[in-house]
Amino acid sequence: MLVEDDHSISEMVDHYLTKEGFGIVHAFDGEEGIRLFQQGSYDLVLLDIMLPKLNGMDFLKIIREKSNIPVLMISAKDGDVDKALGLGFGADDYIAKPFSMIELTARVKAAIRRATQYSAEEPAVNKVIRIHQLAIDIDNVSVLKNGEPLQLTSTEWQLLCLFASNPKKVFTKEQIYRSVWNEEYFDDQNIINVHMRRLREKIEDDPSSPQYIKTLWGIGYKLGEF
């Protein structure tokens, strides 16, 4: 789904992604986007921030109440504050206008690939990683804390699995980005910081003093020890 009020951009994105094999459903304002989202089933949402009737941030908050669908925000705003807001509300990635269609396509494919890995069932013996109050069920793609399910986005799930599967390893931000986003790292620390903060808000008792994922200042992150 593409939610974009600029018809020229919408047509350009549609033309390019259709050639790449994607089917596109268009919405030209936030309210139409919500209506279409509730009526259909989609692999990803491309979402502009500045929309009529309902802006992109409010759109994102509404769909995040019930869905973990990958969301890639596209906007003319390129400030760190706007990027942090979008990611903070639950976007998986962010790209600023004007953007390269090659880069946009790569980000779309990467987001869908992460979501597919998140939802795929593996024909293996059920593997559950237990860390203090967390039970991370790899095959059923679920996380429980004290027996209660946690709702993670695909990116948050990939981050948690990365640390849980490598309990002794210290990860630099470059290593995290390459592992989770499967792309070259261009020193965009903000995107990792925001996703890490959102994950901690869900798994930690006190996100300001994290125990599950520790920060090693100037180095990176590692799984906490209990």
Swiss-Prot record:
Keywords: Cytoplasm, DNA-binding, Phosphoprotein, Transcription, Transcription regulation, Two-component regulatory system. The keyword Nucleotidyltransferase does not apply. Pfam families: Response_reg, Trans_reg_C. GO terms for biological process: regulation of DNA-templated transcription. Residues 126-225 bind DNA. It is found in: Cytoplasm. PROSITE patterns: OMPR_PHOB, RESPONSE_REGULATORY. InterPro entries: CheY-like_superfamily, OmpR/PhoB-type_DNA-bd, Sig_transdc_resp-reg_C-effctor, Sig_transdc_resp-reg_receiver, WalR-like, WH-like_DNA-bd_sf. Phosphorylated by YcbM. GO terms for cellular component: cytosol; protein-DNA complex. It comes from the Bacteria. Signal peptide: none annotated. GO terms for molecular function: phosphorelay response regulator activity; transcription cis-regulatory region binding. The modification 4-aspartylphosphate is found at residue 48. SUPFAM superfamilies: C-terminal effector domain of the bipartite response regulators, CheY-like. Residues 1-112 form the Response regulatory domain. Member of the two-component regulatory system YcbM/YcbL. This is Uncharacterized transcriptional regulatory protein YcbL. It comes from Bacillus subtilis (strain 168).
